[in-house]
């Protein structure tokens, strides 16, 4: 039994790219009808929804925007068909239209009305399950086909060609031959990236905790290994100072000063004043000089 798509095409006669496009289009239609797929808006609505107070039926989840834009996939089904299908399945509780402007100036109007739960959920769930299975099969086939493209893109050696993407990442990380910092660098450029994958070399859970003793010994090891030019070893310097302090050498005797009398006489009137003092003393005591210094003239 051949499976027919809504536009009349046969699933078995389609190329892998056409299968991927058709499955993504149908999956988008179902998700838009059920209000699934917008993870960021669901998280925001769970945290705080400023329009929840004005809603008639509390506890309802917002639907996906009716008009969706994809960078690589162009949908042939107009947005009016999606809106009509979603309106038939669900009854809107509160209408909300949002106008957004893109960096290139294009205006995008989306209908983010809050809708009620579906009455025919079992049929849609079954269709959603089938589409998910088809998407998984198509993606698995693309992974097999893209393994050769990845090896040709990065010019890998012959021993790494023909292996899967996960094995290639593990091998590059284990052997340390310049593996990229992020895993999405190995993903084919044509495949859309929904989010930034974490680094391959994840830190441990206890990365916030630090051992002070280990950090001290790490700094001490770095200090001992890296030294400034001309710097003395601290341990040798301390032992040298300690030896000098313990050494008790005999104190050297200071040279004694030899006193030499000074007989120098300054040329002044000391002799004349001494002579005058002696004459005065002789006159006071009535002592006649023994010899006159000059001869007496006859009168």
UniProtKB/Swiss-Prot annotation:
This is Centriolar and ciliogenesis-associated protein HYLS1. One of its GO terms (cellular component) is cytosol. Keywords: Cell projection, Ciliopathy, Cilium biogenesis/degradation, Cytoplasm, Cytoskeleton, Disease variant, Phosphoprotein. InterPro entries: Centriolar_ciliogenesis_assoc (IPR052319), HYLS1 (IPR026227), HYLS1_C_dom (IPR027918). GO terms for biological process: cilium assembly. Belongs to the HYLS1 family. The gene is HYLS1. The modification Phosphoserine is found at residue 179.
């Amino acid at each position: 039994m051949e499976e027919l798509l809504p536009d009349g095409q046969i699933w078995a006669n389609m190329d892998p790219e056409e299968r991927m496009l058709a499955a993504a289009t149908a999956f988008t239609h179902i998700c838009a009808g059920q209000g699934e797929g917008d993870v960021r808006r669901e998280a925001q609505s769970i945290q705080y929804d400023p329009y929840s107070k004005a809603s008639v039926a509390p506890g309802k989840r917002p639907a996906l925007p009716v008009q969706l834009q994809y960078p690589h996939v162009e949908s042939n089904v107009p947005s009016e068909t999606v809106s009509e299908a979603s309106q038939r399945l669900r009854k809107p509780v509160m209408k909300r239209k949002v106008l957004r402007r893109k960096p290139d100036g294009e205006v995008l109007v989306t209908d983010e009305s809050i809708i009620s739960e579906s009455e025919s959920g079992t049929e849609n769930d079954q269709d959603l399950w089938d589409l998910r299975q088809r998407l998984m099969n198509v993606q698995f086939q693309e992974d097999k086909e893209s393994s050769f493209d990845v090896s040709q893109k990065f010019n890998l050696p012959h021993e790494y060609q023909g292996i899967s993407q996960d094995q290639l990442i593990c091998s590059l990380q284990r052997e340390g031959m310049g593996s990229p910092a992020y895993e999405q660098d190995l993903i084919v450029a044509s495949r859309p990236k929904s989010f930034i994958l974490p680094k391959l070399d994840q830190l441990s859970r206890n990365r916030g905790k630090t051992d002070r003793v280990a950090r001290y010994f790490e700094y001490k090891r770095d200090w001992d290994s890296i030294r400034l030019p001309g710097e003395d070893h601290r341990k040798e310097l301390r032992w040298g100072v300690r030896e000098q302090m313990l050494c008790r050498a005999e104190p050297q005797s200071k040279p004694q000063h030899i006193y030499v009398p000074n007989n120098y006489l300054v040329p002044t009137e000391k002799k004349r004043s001494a002579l005058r003092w002696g004459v005065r003393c002789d006159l006071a005591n009535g002592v006649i000089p023994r010899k006159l210094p000059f001869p007496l003239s006859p009168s």
